Amino acid sequence: MARLLEHYRGEVKPKLKDEMGYKNIMEVPKLEKVVVNMGIGDAKDNPKILDNAVENLEQVTGQKPVVTKAKRSIANFKVRQGMPVGCKVTLRGERMYHFLDKLINVALPRVRDFKGVSPKAFDGRGNYSLGLKEQMVFPELEYDDIERVQGMDIIIATTAETDEEAKKLLERLGMPFSG
């Protein structure tokens, strides 16, 4: 079982129940899913860039990504409907906890000049988003194997009703918020 999942079930869940004043343990917010997305604008010119991004994302998450396609044509970006423009992975269950554990304890501390993640990136419904400027912070990726430094968006969806509940949950799980 994932270390972070054990920590959640053993320590975080009971403490949050007492702290928030819930009557039932099932009311305590939990992680629902983690979506990792890489938007690759240059995929239209060079399909090899997209293949590398898919490979990198698979190494980082342990799951094969889905190639995302443009929903509509945009002439200014020279993109036609149906063209591949990125890739994403939706993680749930044990893989989600493994990835989040690795993100919090390994990847984020390796970010240059890291002072914590913004506490303002909640969406109003208990979900949190953060962006990484480069994929090199993950230990699975070797510097020599990377053809192009690529950023990624990470969305953490929770069952929390409010941003405050979600923030308390993520803080208890070890998310390093700044300020």
From Swiss-Prot:
One of its GO terms (biological process) is translation. This is one of the proteins that bind and probably mediate the attachment of the 5S RNA into the large ribosomal subunit, where it forms part of the central protuberance. In the 70S ribosome it contacts protein S13 of the 30S subunit (bridge B1b), connecting the 2 subunits; this bridge is implicated in subunit movement. Contacts the P site tRNA; the 5S rRNA and some of its associated proteins might help stabilize positioning of ribosome-bound tRNAs. This is Large ribosomal subunit protein uL5. NCBIfam families: PRK00010.1. The keyword Ribonucleoprotein applies. Keywords: Ribonucleoprotein, Ribosomal protein, RNA-binding, rRNA-binding, tRNA-binding. It holds the Pfam family Ribosomal_L5. One of its GO terms (molecular function) is rRNA binding. Belongs to the universal ribosomal protein uL5 family. InterPro entries: Ribosomal_uL5, Ribosomal_uL5_bac-type, Ribosomal_uL5_C, Ribosomal_uL5_CS, Ribosomal_uL5_dom_sf, Ribosomal_uL5_N. Part of the 50S ribosomal subunit; part of the 5S rRNA/L5/L18/L25 subcomplex. Contacts the 5S rRNA and the P site tRNA. Forms a bridge to the 30S subunit in the 70S ribosome. The keyword Transmembrane does not apply. HAMAP family: Ribosomal_uL5_B. GO terms for cellular component: ribonucleoprotein complex; ribosome.
